[in-house]
């Protein structure tokens, strides 16, 4: 699947087209019905939590079903208690992701 790059304003229809997904595929990934997604694409105001889920799932390509509280806690702990280890792991993770 392609990665959609966007500016600060997230236009869901543009992202969906860049990813080559239909409305059902695109919106169901973040728990929105096809008809609800269609309304957002037509200009209805999108709540901030929906916009953030859209960004995480489709722009950042994060599988939000796999995010666990423990994982978030580990990252927060490393960032605050051992920032050098966090930076080193972040660098290694980026290299690993590029090699896949």
Over which residues does each language-model region extend?
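DNA major-groove recognition helix of helix-turn-helix/homeodomain DNA-binding modules
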Residues: 46-67
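Short alpha-helical DNA-recognition segment
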Residues: 20-38
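Short, charged recognition helix plus adjacent turn
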Residues: 61-100
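A short, Lys/Arg-rich alpha-helix, primarily the initiator
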Residues: 1-18
């Amino acid at each position: 699947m392609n990665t959609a790059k966007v500016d600060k304003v997230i236009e869901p229809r543009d992202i969906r087209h860049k990813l080559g997904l239909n409305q059902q595929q695109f919106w169901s990934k973040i728990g929105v019905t096809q008809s609800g997604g269609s309304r957002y694409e037509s200009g209805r105001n999108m709540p901030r939590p929906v916009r953030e889920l859209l960004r995480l799932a489709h722009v950042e390509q994060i599988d939000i079903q796999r995010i666990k509280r423990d994982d978030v806690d580990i990252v927060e702990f490393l960032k605050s208690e051992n920032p050098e280890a966090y930076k080193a792991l972040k660098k290694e993770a980026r290299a690993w992701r590029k090699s896949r």
